[in-house]
């Protein structure tokens, strides 16, 4: 009888843990914008990316784990780049390297986001 109660308790506990477990944060354009906002100064001419900028790049790179996430991030980056005046696209392309991050595609307004895997 005690083992039956234990099994029921364990099942209930596991179900509660599954329901209460936080969902993975999906990539959104809002997330991309907030992570990369500290980089705007560098992209518009400041001499080097700030620690906050590189932290955002690293965080975004870690969050974009799936191909769908990377495609979304790419699309958001392209959209944001066209709405911000004075972006130096050469600096944008070098930003991941400047921050020690490897990105599997070129950072460019001409990048085909649908080809990202």
UniProtKB/Swiss-Prot annotation:
| Single GO biological process annotation from the record | lipid transport
Got any disulfides in this one, which pairs?
29-76, 39-53, 54-99, 74-113
Q: What's the domain of life for this entry?
A: Eukaryota
Molecular functions (GO terms): lipid binding
Name residues in a coiled coil.
none
Signal peptide position in this chain? Answer: 1-26
Pfam families given for it? Tryp_alpha_amyl
Alphabetized, the UniProt keywords read: Antimicrobial, Disulfide bond, Fungicide, Lipid-binding, Plant defense, Signal, Transport
Family (UniProt): Belongs to the plant LTP family.
Per its database record, what is this protein's job?
Plant non-specific lipid-transfer proteins transfer phospholipids as well as galactolipids across membranes. May play a role in wax or cutin deposition in the cell walls of expanding epidermal cells and certain secretory tissues. Also has fungicide activity.
Could you identify this protein by its name?
Non-specific lipid-transfer protein
User: What is the organism lineage in this UniProt record?
Assistant: Eukaryota, Viridiplantae, Streptophyta, Embryophyta, Tracheophyta
